[in-house]
């Protein structure tokens, strides 16, 4: 065989090998390009566009130990197969679903970076069942915590402290294409004040935020040490049931700004930093029922800033400064509640009007029912006020509080007082 022939054969072989390598590279590129799991290093964010995906799918697709890996346990010198460390944010795209459940996850620990919170943001659906999701600080081998001297009541210094700490959060976005269901799980040490508004910290990064995802469910969870607890804006048709909500920095449950058609039932809400359950700013068609709420610095249950056509019933509220507080809201009903050991049992205040307060048991308050500051045309009837320490019924007529109706209220060990 001539050398010329050898050169031709060698060239042909090189071309063939090159072609095969090119085909393999092109195939891999296409597979990556068409994958429903991708990673944006610039944003440090994992994108999920799969119809259904879980953490094993993400791990298999990305194979990137710097952003997602199983936890190594030094005591056993082995990997905990169901404890995951996430060092990035996640975005669930429209029409996609991310499943985080006990089949492959026991505990998801999310590490915030120095510049980003590394949130889970949902434009599709999120399904969480029987897992624990928290922030994590690998340097301290502990949750990401706010300094102990941060107190909501000291708003200026607290805001400075809160804004210095970044923590991951879960946020369901306004245009989410499906419901999010979080149940039987523990959500803790999430949320921060990384997004500020004129008068404080935005609820957008507050910890567990639902701005969309019609027919979502939050059920049978432990929710604690979250910055703002549960928060929603414009959310509709949602069930919040059977949760323990406690030790959150500001509020326990805070439906906000146009939230509507929501049921908040059978939750235990206690020891949060300011208010237990507050619905504020144009919320309507909210039912708050069957909850036990206690031990907050300010208020147990509050209707605030134009809340209307809503109900608080069959709740047990105790050991509060104000057990139930209706402020600047109208056409609501407060009935069949038991409130006890509060400075004020039921406060109707700040131009609240046309509300009905009836069939409530108000036990050992300082003031039983307190009506003031322009609250008018409200009805109070068939309430039982037992052992009020100071005043069973207080009506501040000097501040344009008028046209309120009181009928068939029972007062034991005290007499009504008009100031």
Regions found by a protein language model. Give the residues of each.
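Detector for the Zn2+-coordinating histidines of canonical Cys2His2
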Residues: 243, 291, 337, 360, ...
């Amino acid at each position: 065989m001539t050398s010329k022939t050898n050169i031709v054969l060698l060239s042909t072989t090189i071309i063939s090998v090159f072609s095969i390598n090119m085909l393999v590279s092109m195939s891999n590129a296409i597979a990556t390009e068409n994958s429903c799991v991708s990673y944006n290093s610039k944003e440090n964010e994992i994108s999920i566009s799969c119809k259904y995906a879980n953490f094993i799918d993400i791990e298999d697709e990305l194979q990137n130990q710097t952003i997602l890996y199983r936890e190594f346990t030094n005591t056993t010198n082995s990997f905990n197969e169901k404890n995951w460390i996430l060092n990035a944010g996640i975005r669930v795209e429209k029409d996609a679903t991310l499943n985080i459940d006990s089949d492959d996850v026991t505990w998801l620990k999310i590490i915030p970076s120095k510049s980003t919170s590394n949130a889970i943001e949902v434009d599709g659906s999120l399904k969480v069942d029987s897992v624990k999701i928290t922030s994590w600080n690998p340097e301290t081998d502990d949750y990401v915590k706010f300094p102990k001297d941060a107190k909501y009541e000291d708003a200026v210094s607290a805001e400075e402290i809160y804004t210095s700490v970044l923590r991951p959060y879960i946020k369901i976005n306004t245009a989410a294409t499906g419901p999010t269901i979080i149940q039987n799980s523990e959500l803790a040490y999430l949320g921060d004040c990384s997004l500020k508004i004129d008068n404080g910290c935005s609820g957008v990064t507050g910890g567990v935020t639902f701005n969309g995802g019609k027919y979502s469910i939050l059920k049978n969870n432990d929710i604690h040490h979250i910055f703002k607890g549960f928060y929603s804006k414009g959310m509709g048709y949602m069930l919040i049931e059977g949760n323990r909500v406690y030790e959150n920095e500001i509020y326990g449950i805070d439906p906000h700004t146009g939230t509507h058609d929501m049921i908040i039932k059978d939750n235990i809400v206690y020891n949060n930093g300011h208010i237990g359950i507050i619905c504020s700013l144009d919320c309507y068609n909210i039912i708050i029922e069957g909850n036990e709420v206690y031990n907050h610095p300010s208020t147990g249950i509050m209707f605030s800033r134009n809340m209307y056509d809503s109900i608080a019933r069959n709740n047990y509220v105790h050991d509060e400064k104000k057990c139930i507080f209706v402020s600047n809201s109208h056409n609501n009903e407060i009935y069949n509640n038991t409130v006890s050991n509060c400075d004020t049992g039921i406060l109707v205040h700040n131009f609240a009007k046309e509300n009905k307060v009836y069939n409530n048991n108000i036990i050992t308050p300082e003031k039983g029912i307190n009506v003031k500051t322009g609250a008018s045309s409200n009805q109070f009837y068939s309430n039982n006020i037992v052992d009020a320490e100071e005043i069973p019924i207080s009506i501040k007529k000097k501040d344009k509080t008028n046209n309120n109706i009181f009928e068939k209220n029972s007062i034991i060990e005290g007499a009504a007082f008009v100031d």
